[in-house]
A protein has these predicted regions:
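Two-component histidine phosphotransfer core
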Residues: 1-117, 125-127
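C-terminal end segment of the histidine kinase catalytic
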Residues: 119-149
């Protein structure tokens, strides 16, 4: 996860140059010693910048945290941007390719999940969860077959 977090940090440094005081970023990284598929965070952070905080006249803040729980690793990307109505977005007929690609990579490569919650006028929270034990619905047989035993 440290490589993905570093890519996000570099991306946000560039965006902060572009948007100045309108884009604030805070980090709370307790752990980064776990597997995270490539390009599983940057699309979420890009959405927070492009569709969240920079849509507010006064800008806003993006908070990125990573922590370990007993059963999983969690990376949370939260913003205080404009938010959105999930029902309207789901029904607008557009495909949300970036988010679906992230969700697919997480599921396929590590049994992870992506949950997104948003409220208009409040902001958005995207949470990635990576189980410590891997995908319990199919990954065990793959692992057993490829462990050499």
């Amino acid at each position: 996860a440290s490589r993905e977090l570093e890519h996000v940090r570099c991306y946000l440094n560039l965006e902060r140059i572009r948007f100045g005081a309108h884009l604030r970023v805070e980090y709370a990284i307790e752990t980064s010693d776990f597997f995270l598929p490539a390009l599983s965070l940057q699309p979420l952070v890009e959405n927070a910048v492009r569709h969240g905080v920079t849509k507010r006249e006064e800008g806003g803040t993006i908070w990125i945290s990573a922590r370990e729980t007993e059963e999983s690793y969690q990376v949370t990307i939260r913003d205080d941007g404009v938010g959105f109505d999930p029902v309207r977005v789901r029904g607008d007929g557009r495909e949300h390719v970036g988010i679906e690609n992230v969700r697919s990579r997480l599921t396929a490569q590590c049994g992870g999940t992506l949950c997104i919650a948003s409220q208009e006028g409040v902001g958005t929270v995207a949470q990635v969860r990576i189980p410590k034990t891997g995908d319990t619905q199919g990954k065990e047989s793959f692992d057993a077959d490829h462990r050499g035993g």
